[in-house]
Amino acid sequence: MIKLRLKRYGKKREASFRLVACNSTSRRDGRPLEELGFYNPRTKETRLDTEALRTRLSQGAQPTDAVRSLLEKGGLIEKTIRPAEIEGKKKQALARQSASKKAVKEKTEESKGSEVDSETSTSAD
């Protein structure tokens, strides 16, 4: 299976990436079948060989998640929402709701506790 992935190069902490087509079992920085583009995350510079990318995609090449997002931004493929992403977003939303409910409960309990403390201190005077 042919994968479209990012091949890292550059200095330490100054990485740049080449968008390459390679065999799915090859190493990340191994020899690619074809170089299809360039991406620099620091400057957000992206260069894509659109004709070659369309050819590879029509042949059945599978892009990785990072490459898929670059291709979506470049307008080569439509933005897709996969079922796993939908489920993950639902779980995240539920987690946020439960966390906010817990925070509200803690605040109300703290305020009730401080009211009781202030009442006991005023009645003791």
Curated annotation (Swiss-Prot):
Keywords: Ribonucleoprotein, Ribosomal protein. This is Small ribosomal subunit protein bS16. Residues 103-115 have a biased composition (Basic and acidic residues). Residues 87-125 are annotated as: Disordered. One of its GO terms (cellular component) is small ribosomal subunit. Belongs to the bacterial ribosomal protein bS16 family. GO terms for biological process: translation. InterPro entries: Ribosomal_bS16, Ribosomal_bS16_CS, Ribosomal_bS16_dom_sf. One of its GO terms (molecular function) is structural constituent of ribosome.
